[in-house]
């Protein structure tokens, strides 16, 4: 019979027999089993099975059997197996029986839609009755829904596991890239990165275990889908480890990545007339060498001079508004930053040790030649070689007071002095006058009480001609070594027992031997005096030190000086000609005789010289009189290679009587 939309109680109800009930139950069980199998097969096949049935339906449009199967598979594939949909179907089953019955009946139900909702459906009255059909159909729908939900949960679990494996592989690749990027970082940073890397791996493993545990239950399919979406998008790299302020202070300004750049001190000008004036650092090449290593300047209680020295020159239009206008060149040293430093010997670099100490009152050092005229300022090189650095805050001699282990920047000020103005002595007075400030970044230095960097010490010894105290002698901490060395040298030269060539002989040899070779040889002999001043050598050894004999003399009856074998000394020292010392001795004897007779000696000797006034040596060559020691008292001054010969006074009467 046909089942229409009319009420079912319009026809008389028939009581089913027991045999019909048993047949209906067996058929219902078969339908449930077949429905579950069909639902599982549809879910496994997916879209391929759907496309296959679409093509099959296109080739057989008039076949009702294929059309019926196609509608049935479409219903199964389009079914939503989410939790919300299953609960909605379960809640609406008692109120609206037709959608659930018609959508899940495997044998005799067509596809239900809004357009054919009023169509009649053929129902076998013999197999079922109105009283048993609703409950049996609901049970079949519940069983099919449960089977489909189980199959969907199994598939979602597999997809979630695959997504987790992909996410773990991506995380491992990102970790390898981060390790390669930070391979050249410092040891401290590598340790912190290793710690963060280990903690991130622990969190990832715990999250992976939780995700696997949650994906096993069918009630967490929504979280699994979210994990799949998160795996498709690569996670951003973790932020770099944050550094504490204490760690930043331990790093040097050049090595701290998060630290702000060192503030740079720039020049200034408050006068338009001084704007085109330029200042040039004369010793820029030497300053650049020290700046690459980190310049250090010694400060002491008594004050120490700067090396390299600040030497500048000026160029440009130095205008003179009034005839009385003059210029002054000033120097001051200002702190570069507000930090105190320490030197790390194991790293050979300067590190920040903390905040700076309170700065002493700023002082301005004026050049001693100031004030200068514009013409003199253009031609003159202004050298601040006399400025001294000290750490004595009670100093009253005008020295620049600095703090040890702090960085400083020297500045040059060009001040125009009008009529009635004096040289400023403080920064406050400088601001009230027309001036221009020049800054050279290569002159930055660190004030120290002892050199920290060994390369700086070596460079200063090699570059500073007054650094002999570092090579030789004692450790003088509170005294300036340059004046001490000058004092020792002066005392040594005053008491030197040996002079190669006396000054009367030099005055006689200089006009005759005016060629460059002879003068250079004499200067070399004078320089050797510094080496042999404290040695017991006398003038008798001069022939053996400076002369190589051409032929050995005949054997004398007694031992003589020619028997000495000086070896390498004879080959290293500059050699003189064979007759140079003999003629020098003759000229010395003539000079002494002329001084005794108060007359000028002849310029040259054409005849054989007279017998020497002094005893001759065993080798036959005349030697200077070793007993004439009082003659040396007339020349106690220190030797200079550019000494001008002075007029010799006549010797005393005692010397006249002794001379022949």
UniProtKB/Swiss-Prot annotation:
Origin: domain of life: Eukaryota
Record gene name: H15
Comp. bias regions, Low complexity: 12-22, 35-47, 93-108, 169-179, 199-233, 614-624
InterPro entries: p53-like_TF_DNA-bd_sf, T-box_DNA-bd, T-box_sf, TF_Brachyury, TF_T-box, TF_T-box_CS
Residue spans of biased composition, Polar residues class: 1-11, 23-33, 643-660
GO MF term (any one): RNA polymerase II cis-regulatory region sequence-specific DNA binding
Keywords associated with the record: DNA-binding, Nucleus, Transcription, Transcription regulation
DNA-binding region: 286-472
Claim: Nucleotide-binding is one of the keywords in the record: no
Transcription regulation keyword on record: yes
Lineage: Eukaryota, Metazoa, Ecdysozoa, Arthropoda, Hexapoda
Location(s), subcellular: Nucleus
Start and end residues of each stretch annotated as Disordered: 1-72, 90-122, 169-266, 598-660
Species in which this protein is naturally found: Drosophila melanogaster
Record Pfam families: T-box (PF00907)
Record's protein name: T-box protein H15
Biased composition (Basic residues): 48-71, 180-198
GO BP term (any one): embryonic heart tube development
Biased composition (Pro residues): 234-243, 600-613
One cellular component (GO) term of this entry: chromatin
């Amino acid at each position: 019979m046909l089942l229409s939309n009319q009420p079912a109680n319009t026809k008389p109800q028939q009581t089913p027999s027991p045999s019909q009930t048993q047949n209906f139950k067996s058929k219902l069980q078969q339908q449930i089993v077949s429905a579950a199998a069909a639902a599982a097969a549809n879910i496994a096949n997916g879209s391929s099975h759907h496309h296959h049935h679409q093509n099959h339906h296109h080739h057989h449009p008039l076949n009702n059997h294929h059309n019926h199967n196609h509608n049935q598979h479409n219903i199964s594939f389009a079914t939503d197996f989410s939790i919300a949909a299953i609960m909605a179907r379960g809640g609406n089953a008692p109120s609206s029986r037709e959608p659930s019955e018609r959508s899940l009946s495997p044998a005799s139900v067509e596809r239900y839609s809004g357009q054919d909702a009023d169509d009649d459906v053929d129902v076998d009255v013999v197999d079922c009755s109105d009283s048993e059909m609703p409950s049996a159909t609901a049970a079949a729908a519940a069983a099919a829904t449960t089977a489909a939900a189980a199959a969907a949960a199994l598939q979602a679990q597999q997809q979630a596991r695959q997504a987790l494996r992909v996410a773990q592989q991506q995380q491992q690749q990102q970790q390898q890239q981060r390790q390669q990027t930070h391979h050249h970082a410092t040891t401290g940073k590598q340790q912190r990165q290793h710690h963060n890397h280990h903690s991130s791996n622990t969190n990832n493993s715990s999250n992976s275990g939780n995700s696997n545990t949650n994906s096993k239950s069918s009630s967490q399919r929504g979280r699994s889908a979210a994990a799949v979406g998160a795996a498709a998008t690569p996670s951003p790299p973790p932020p770099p480890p944050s550094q504490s302020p204490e760690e930043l202070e331990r790093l040097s300004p050049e090595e701290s990545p998060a630290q702000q750049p060192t503030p740079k001190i720039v020049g200034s000008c408050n006068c338009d007339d001084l704007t085109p004036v330029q200042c040039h650092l004369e010793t820029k090449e030497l300053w650049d060498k020290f700046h690459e290593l980190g310049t250090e300047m010694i400060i002491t209680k008594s004050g120490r001079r700067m090396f390299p020295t600040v030497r500048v020159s000026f160029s440009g239009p130095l205008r003179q508004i009034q005839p009385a206008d003059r210029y002054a060149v000033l120097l001051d040293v200002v702190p570069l930053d507000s930090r105190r430093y320490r030197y790390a010997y194991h790293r050979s670099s300067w590190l920040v040790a903390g905040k700076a100490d309170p700065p002493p009152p700023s002082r301005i050092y004026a050049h001693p030649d100031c004030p200068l005229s514009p013409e003199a300022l253009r031609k003159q090189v202004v050298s601040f070689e006399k400025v001294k650095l000290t750490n004595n805050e009670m100093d009253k001699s005008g020295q620049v007071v600095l703090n040890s282990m702090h960085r400083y920047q020297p500045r040059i000020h060009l001040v125009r002095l009008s009529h009635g103005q004096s040289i400023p002595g403080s920064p406050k007075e400088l601001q009230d006058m027309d001036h221009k400030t020049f800054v050279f970044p290569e002159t930055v230095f660190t004030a120290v009480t002892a050199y920290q960097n060994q390369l700086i010490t070596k460079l200063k010894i090699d570059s500073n001609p007054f650094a002999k105290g570092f090579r030789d002698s004692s450790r003088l901490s509170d005294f300036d070594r340059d004046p001490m060395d000058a004092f020792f040298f002066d005392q040594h030269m005053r008491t030197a027992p040996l002079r190669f060539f006396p000054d009367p002989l030099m005055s006689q040899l200089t006009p005759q031997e005016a060629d460059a070779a002879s003068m250079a040889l004499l200067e070399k002999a004078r320089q050797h005096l510094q080496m042999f001043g404290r040695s017991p050598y006398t003038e008798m050894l001069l022939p053996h030190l400076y002369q190589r004999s051409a032929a050995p003399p005949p054997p004398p009856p007694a031992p003589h000086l020619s028997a000495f074998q000086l070896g390498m000394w004879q080959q290293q020292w500059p050699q003189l000609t064979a007759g140079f010392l003999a003629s020098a001795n003759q000229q010395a004897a003539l000079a002494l005789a002329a001084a005794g007779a108060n007359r000028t000696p002849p310029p040259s000797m054409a005849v054989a010289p007279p017998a020497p006034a002094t005893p001759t040596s065993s080798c036959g060559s005349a030697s200077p009189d070793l007993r004439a020691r009082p003659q040396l008292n007339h020349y106690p001054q220190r030797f200079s290679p550019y000494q001008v010969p002075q007029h010799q006074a006549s010797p005393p009467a005692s010397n006249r009587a002794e001379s022949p």
